[in-house]
Amino acid sequence: GVRVVLFTGNHDMWCYDYLAQECGVEIVRNPRVVEFDGVKVHLAHGDNLNISGQPMLKLMNTIFRASGARTLFSWLVHPDLALKFGLWWSGKSRKSHNKTLMGVDNLRPLVEYAREHNLKNGDVEHYIFGHMHLPHYVREERFEVLFLGDWCGAEAVYATMNDDNNLKLNTFAIDETVS
């Protein structure tokens, strides 16, 4: 089979073990450094990284990620209402991360996170993030930062690494008949 790894982020931080047990999906909740052909790559969803200058977001993420809050929510809120709330919240977030409204400046906190991480761990050559739904490439002196963009919609964005260990953003047109 094909190994499937899901890096949880702001829309799936509450996923428990269903996908792991039923589908064999590996769930990753924190950034991870992996090695491909001797090249170290830092992989992360990107949510909740370098948000120290955003106290309300930090507080909200702390509450949403607390196991007690998740347990209370699952016991006290009917699943139909929880789904409606989740769809509303997701739509609100998606509108704030709209590609036409978001500029490259919004990517700066994650590029700064990569700089700080690279200063401490200088052997990482590539940083790959999702979260912002804006495909973009940043080349720094010692490393590259890649933002994958979306994986759904009219076209999916994915990354490849060539024989020279350089990353490249690619797109794949999604046929509307595929579901």
Predicted feature locations:
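Extended recognition/assembly regions associated with phosphoester-bond processing machinery
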Residues: 1-179
